[in-house]
UniProtKB/Swiss-Prot annotation:
It catalyses: tRNA(Lys) + L-lysine + ATP = L-lysyl-tRNA(Lys) + AMP + diphosphate. It comes from Methanoculleus marisnigri (strain ATCC 35101 / DSM 1498 / JR1). Homodimer. GO terms for cellular component: cytosol. Mg(2+) 2 binds at residue 410. Mg(2+) 1 binds at residues 403, 410. This is Lysine--tRNA ligase. Belongs to the class-II aminoacyl-tRNA synthetase family. It holds the Pfam family tRNA-synt_2. Keywords: Aminoacyl-tRNA synthetase, ATP-binding, Cytoplasm, Ligase, Magnesium, Metal-binding, Nucleotide-binding, Protein biosynthesis. The lineage of its organism: Archaea, Methanobacteriati, Methanobacteriota, Stenosarchaea group, Methanomicrobia.
Length: 508
């Protein structure tokens, strides 16, 4: 291999592949009549004794272990549902077939087998193989069988290998798939309609975040990957769809850590004639329902905590949370006192804070978030950082906005949605002014969205829930990379990012 060959190909395996082809063996056949999965075999023959079954089975899977004992071979194969043992005898297969398996089938190969089922003296349900077919010859070696794949970096970069070797990883992503399916079912049963809104957008909005930018050559136009589907879903409410949702891929050009990935999945839900109290209730109902369905209980273990999803959940205003965790009477303090308090406690961002609302958010983030382990709603946010939320009906300077925190992480964000077009125009103009002054996370002004509101949006409640973090909680994983099949990683190998390898792009 050349120095620029970054494949995992093993010379000995390549040699076996070539020898098989020289013998006329079809190494990569097109199909195999698999009639039984591993789990189906184990369930159907759970009561079998030592005699072979009369019924023939046909199954297939990846070879994990091969144990040779003279004229007999034991092997373990696995499919997406589990593993099962194979028993091969030279007297049954014939010398040619037996030697083919013995000499050329390795761990990592995929085989199809036909045979009968029996239980070994050790009590293991086993397929007594009458005939087999090599379906795929692997040319890359699997990790050592007793230790599996433990290197975290490799597990994330080569998820396919992680899934081959680690049942725990497969179970995590089965759970993720089930969580999303159950979420859809929950919303469908309550008459919400699912829609798809643009991922490429001429104007980004719906959240305060730095976007990814791209260029459409044919239109000669700058476009953005969406940071949220919010403004498009609200357009649908204006258009007459009263209950809508989208399970969306969002993209934010931000740091990567245990809770953040630049590409992530959220569900956003909007319902006409509802407010933020209704959306808090809906969020409780969704998450407690998912916990019960996935775990069989409303209690789950995460990061050393037993999290209780049973309803009702605790609710605190942001001012109440600051009073409890910062130990101050926020409403009674002057701006000067708030500034001095922030400097004294090294609160990040207080040097540039200019309003009471800015201090309130900074103090909550600094003192409060980390203590919110059990599901807790924080509500009544300052208007300064809530440009899409409706003004509070009775509290000056605040909005009807909430966030849900679990295990110190923000899990959901919802509002009584702002539907006053004049107010929305003024607030987005303020955001756009901040953006033009260098605030990279401030929102652009979207006049088409404002015009949509101008035609009339009914009172509406909305909420966005982070799917990735929810999966973390329900599977007990403390890193978002554990619940993303292909998390964003810095390019490690030249050519891995789509550039030509010889140019050296992506080298660390």
């Amino acid at each position: 291999m050349s120095d620029m060959d970054h494949t995992c190909f093993d010379t000995a395996k390549i040699d076996k592949l070539q020898e098989l082809r020289e013998r006329g063996v079809t190494v990569y056949p097109y199909t195999f009549d698999r009639r039984d999965t591993v789990e189906e075999i184990k369930e159907r023959f759970s009561a079998i004794e030592h005699d072979k079954s009369e019924e023939e089975v046909s199954t297939a899977g990846r070879v994990y272990v091969v144990r040779q004992h003279g004229k007999t071979i034991f092997a373990d194969i696995g499919d997406s549902e589990g593993r099962i043992q194979l028993y091969l005898r030279k007297n049954d297969l014939g010398e040619e077939q037996f030697d083919l398996f013995k000499q050329y089938v390795d761990a990592g190969d995929i085989v199809g087998v036909v045979g009968h089922v029996f239980r070994t003296k050790m009590g293991e349900i086993t397929v007594w193989v009458d005939r087999f077919e090599l379906l795929t010859k692997s040319v890359c070696p699997l990790p050592e069988k007793f230790h599996g794949l433990k290197n975290v970096e490799t597990r994330y970069r080569q998820r396919y290998l992680d899934l081959i070797m680690n049942e725990e990883s497969r179970e995590t992503f089965r759970a993720r798939s089930r969580i999303i399916s159950l979420l859809r079912q929950f919303l469908f049963e309550r008459d919400y309609l699912e829609f798809e809104t643009p991922t490429l957008q001429p104007i980004y909005g719906g959240a305060n975040a730095r976007p990814f930018t791209t260029h459409h050559n044919a239109l000669d136009q700058k476009l953005y990957l969406r940071i949220a589907p919010e403004l498009y879903l609200k357009r649908l409410v204006v258009g007459g769809f009263d209950k809508v949702f989208e399970i969306a891929k969002n993209f934010r050009n931000e740091d990567i850590d245990t809770n953040h990935n630049p590409e992530f999945t959220m569900v956003e839900v909007y319902e006409a004639y509802r407010d933020y109290n209704d959306m808090m209730n809906l969020t409780e109902e969704i998450l407690s329902h998912l916990a019960e369905k996935v775990l069989g209980t409303t209690v789950c273990s995460f990061a050393g905590h037993d999290l209780d999803f049973s309803r009702p959940w605790r609710r605190l205003t942001m001012e109440e949370a600051v009073r409890e965790y910062a130990g101050i009477d926020f409403p009674a303090m002057s701006l000067e006192e708030l500034h001095a308090f922030g400097l004294e406690h090294c609160v990040e961002g207080c040097e540039s804070a200019a309003t009471r609302g800015e201090y309130l958010v900074l103090f909550f983030e600094h003192f409060g978030e980390k203590h919110l382990i059990q599901p807790t709603f924080i509500y009544d946010f300052p208007i300064e950082n809530s440009p899409l939320a409706k003004k509070h009906r009775s509290k000056e300077g605040l909005t009807e906005r909430f966030e849900l925190f679990i295990a110190g992480m923000e899990m959901a964000n919802g509002f009584s949605e702002l539907n006053d077009p004049l107010d929305q125009k003024a607030r987005l103009e303020q955001q756009d002014a901040k953006r033009r002054k260098g605030d990279l996370e401030a929102q652009m002004i979207d006049y088409d969205f404002i015009n949509a509101l101008g035609y009339g949006m009914p009172p509406t409640g909305g909420v966005g829930i982070g799917i990735d973090r929810l999966v973390m909680l329900l599977t007990g994983k403390d890193s978002i990379k554990e619940v993303l099949l292909f998390p964003q990683m810095k390019t490690a190998v030249p050519g891995q990012n789509g550039d030509k390898a010889e140019e050296g792009d992506g080298e660390e």
